[in-house]
């Protein structure tokens, strides 16, 4: 059945009620602050799961909320209606956002020592903005929310970052992504001046001249490529990950990196098809470079967080590779890879944080032989590293299989080059697990407590979903495929 059209509005209402209730809790009552934020984020997750359970997977937009823009009458222009809607693509990114937010609160339960109330409000505001980005059907609204995400993320890294370089890392993140976003704004202005609207559904029925499409695509590409991040626009990512608190790393790797791929799939292919097709060989070349460069650079890392960050560059290269082959397999693989990477990379950052909280170092050379002292952690870490190298029955295997299938269909040389990423992925994943888990116990590791109940509860949903999506990929593939086929930009 098709759920009530205002259900999406109810989800946003729950988000704002959560923010209001956290604001009402006294600053010195830290336990109540955390419980209130956790309860309301779980309520949002429940509402999002109900939306998924009642969603009609045929592919069309559902739960459409429409509101008029507030524009002063004296101005000589009028923007179209403000549309928020969900289809088979955006639905899963909403679920991923709703899932990772309470997990972020849980994993930060004991690590945030100051400005706890502001920290929780940052997380909840970030959830509102991300939910809005993934349901926006107006380009101007998408841009406003897209830009708004910079503020809470800047604060998360700069205020609650874990090391002395956190302020520099936050400025790196803000500068790169803000400058990139300016080009998108210029593209939106060019689009509006050409057709007089930024409404997504109206733009689907308008065919722009190829020359205009190319200029607009260039603006969108520079913005979205920074967010993915695509080589050579990735410089900000390792620094931001290393300095960010664990919740910042989870949000960054799990959701924010997906905004670029989502923007390409949602806007550039349907609205700028000719320009996207024209630039596809160039983007595919960059994607192959990202896969090889990201994988080789990952093998050289000595910091646990940097290793996972650079592996993300390689995996997101597979996303853009799938997107710009413009085949059903490639587009489905891109969405599946984004969701799988959101689960696996988030879980890996959480696992690394568990080690850091016990031993206060992220340098791989100090870790050795924790199998006997932390058997539960080692078991979870084994699942995550094997998934990261895309073993069968894992979600990464499904995503990489379809990505490489699309690559080989596009060009056999591209397919072979992209496939080398799987070899290097296995190399650094096995090295990481072997170095941390086996051998004689390191003299540097004095604190050996295994995972507690809270830590297990936080990471378990991600591990379970990794297997569920690996065994039952049709849960995502079918609705995503239907949504792509329904879209004018579908293959």
From Swiss-Prot:
GO terms for biological process: ATP synthesis coupled electron transport; electron transport coupled proton transport. Pfam families: Proton_antipo_M (PF00361). Keywords: Electron transport, Membrane, Mitochondrion, NAD, Respiratory chain, Translocase, Transmembrane, Transmembrane helix, Transport, Ubiquinone. Its main location: mitochondrion. It catalyses: a ubiquinone + NADH + 5 H(+)(in) = a ubiquinol + NAD(+) + 4 H(+)(out). Its EC number is 7.1.1.2. It is a multi-pass membrane protein. InterPro entries: NADH_Q_OxRdtase_chainM/4 (IPR010227), NADH_UbQ_OxRdtase (IPR003918), ND/Mrp_TM (IPR001750). GO terms for cellular component: mitochondrial membrane. The chain crosses the membrane at residues 2-22, 37-57, 89-109, 114-134, 139-159, 169-189, 215-235, 245-265, 271-291, 308-328, 332-352, 372-392, 412-432, 457-477. Belongs to the complex I subunit 4 family. This is NADH-ubiquinone oxidoreductase chain 4. The gene is ND4.
């Amino acid at each position: 059945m098709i759920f009530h059209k205002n259900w999406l509005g109810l989800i946003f209402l729950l988000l704002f009620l959560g923010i209001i209730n956290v604001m009402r809790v006294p600053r010195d009552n830290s336990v109540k602050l955390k419980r209130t934020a956790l309860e309301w984020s779980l309520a949002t997750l429940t509402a999002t799961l109900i939306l998924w359970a009642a969603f009609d997977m045929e592919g069309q937009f559902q739960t459409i909320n429409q509101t008029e823009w507030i524009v002063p009458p004296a101005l000589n222009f009028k923007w179209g209606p403000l549309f928020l809607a969900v289809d088979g693509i955006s639905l899963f990114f909403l679920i991923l956002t709703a899932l990772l937010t309470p997990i972020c609160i849980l994993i930060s339960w004991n690590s945030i020592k100051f400005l706890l109330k502001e920290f929780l409000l940052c997380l909840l505001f970030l959830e509102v903005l991300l939910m809005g980005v993934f349901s926006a059907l107006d380009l101007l609204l998408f841009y406003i929310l897209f830009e708004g995400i910079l503020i809470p993320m800047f604060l998360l890294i700069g205020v609650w970052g874990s090391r002395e370089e956190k302020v520099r890392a936050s400025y790196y993140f803000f500068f790169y992504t803000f400058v990139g976003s300016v080009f998108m704004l210029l593209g939106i202005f060019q689009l509006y001046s050409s057709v007089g609207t930024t409404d997504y559904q109206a733009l689907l029925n308008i065919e722009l001249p190829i020359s205009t499409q190319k200029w607009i695509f260039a603006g969108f590409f520079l913005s979205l490529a920074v967010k993915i991040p695509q080589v050579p626009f990735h410089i900000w990512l390792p620094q931001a990950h290393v300095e960010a608190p664990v919740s910042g790393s989870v949000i960054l790797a799990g959701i924010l990196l997906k905004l670029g791929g989502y923007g390409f799939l949602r806007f550039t292919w349907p609205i700028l098809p000719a320009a996207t097709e024209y630039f596809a060989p160039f983007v595919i070349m960059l994607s192959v470079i990202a896969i090889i460069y990201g994988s080789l650079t990952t093998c050289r890392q000595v910091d646990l967080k940097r290793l996972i960050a650079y592996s993300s560059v390689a995996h997101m290269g597979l996303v853009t590779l799938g997107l710009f082959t413009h085949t059903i397999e490639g587009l489905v693989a891109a969405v599946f890879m984004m969701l799988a990477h959101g689960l696996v990379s988030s879980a890996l950052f959480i696992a690394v944080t568990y080690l850091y909280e016990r031993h206060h170092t992220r340098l791989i050379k100090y870790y050795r032989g924790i199998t006997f002292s932390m058997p539960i952690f080692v078991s979870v870490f084994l699942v995550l590293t094997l998934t990261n190298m895309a073993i069968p029955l894992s979600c990464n295997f499904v995503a990489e299989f379809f990505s490489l299938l699309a690559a080989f269909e596009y060009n056999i040389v591209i397919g072979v080059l992209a496939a080398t990423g799987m070899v290097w992925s296995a190399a650094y994943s096995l090295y990481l697990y072997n170095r941390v888990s086996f051998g004689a116990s390191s003299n540097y590791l004095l604190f050996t407590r295994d995972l507690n109940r809270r830590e297990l509860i936080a990471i378990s949903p991600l591990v379970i979903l990794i297997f569920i999506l690996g065994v039952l990929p049709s849960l995502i593939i079918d609705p995503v495929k239907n949504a792509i086929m329904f879209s004018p930009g579908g293959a």
